[in-house]
């Protein structure tokens, strides 16, 4: 019987900086952080900016909406959408060790009626029929251990992202990296959404 090739995933570790705990993927790059005494606070400015979609919706409707995070990180967005906004929330994460770390060290709740984590490839998962046209807030933060560029950054991927959204749905993407090209990423998003639909925060 043929053996399936095993995907090599980076080890997960963390560090402490005063009241803040950081998640790392086998490198110095911070993949997410948590204020230990206030685990749902959004510590980093870029994470706060990924909540910019709230500017475009009626606050009274937020709890009735659905959020989907591609990339769990330290679970900041997942915890915030679930606990603070009371939204139905799902995260898709490739690395089971990241999920284990989030549950053990970053106070991510167990799966429940309003929150779940799916272990899998985000690019494949979002193409499943269950995600078509149902997501109100899609939050994309997909980096490897080197944090050099988004690991999923193609026009086809962004077209699949758009297909998950409701009519009022919004996608926020963390664009950061030592070798990533901001404009090239924007052009790929524009191919799916149209340049007029893109905003920088």
Range-by-range predicted roles:
Residues 1-30:
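N-terminal auxiliary segments of SAM/dcSAM-dependent transferases
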Residues 5, 38-167, 180:
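The AdoMet/dcAdoMet-binding core of the Class I SAM-like
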Residues 28-32, 143-146, 171:
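A short, flexible beta-alpha/helix-coil linker loop
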Residues 32, 120-122, 194:
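Glycine-centered flexibility motif
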Residues 33-37:
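Short acidic, glycine/proline-rich loop/turn micro-motifs
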Residues 155-201:
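C-terminal substrate-binding/active-site "lid" region of AdoMet-derived donor-dependent transferases
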């Amino acid at each position: 019987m043929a053996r399936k090739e095993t995907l090599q995933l980076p080890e997960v570790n963390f560090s402490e900086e005063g009241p803040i705990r950081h998640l790392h993927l086998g490198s110095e790059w911070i993949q997410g952080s948590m204020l230990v005494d206030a685990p749902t606070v959004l510590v980093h400015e870029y994470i706060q900016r990924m909540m910019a979609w709230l500017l475009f919706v009626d606050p009274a409707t937020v709890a009735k909406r659905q959020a989907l995070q591609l990339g769990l990180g330290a679970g900041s967005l997942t915890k915030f959408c679930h606990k603070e906004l009371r939204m139905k929330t799902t995260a898709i994460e490739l690395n089971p060790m990241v999920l284990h770390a989030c549950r053990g060290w970053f106070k991510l709740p167990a799966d429940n009626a309003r929150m779940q984590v799916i272990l899998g490839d985000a690019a494949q998962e979002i193409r499943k029929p269950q995600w078509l046209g149902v997501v109100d807030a899609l939050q994309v933060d997909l980096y490897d251990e080197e944090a050099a560029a988004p690991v999923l950054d193609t026009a086809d991927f962004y077209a699949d992202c758009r297909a998950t959204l409701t009519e009022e749905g919004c996608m926020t993407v963390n664009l950061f990296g030592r070798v990533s090209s901001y404009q090239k990423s924007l052009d790929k998003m524009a191919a799916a959404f149209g340049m007029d639909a893109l905003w920088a925060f």
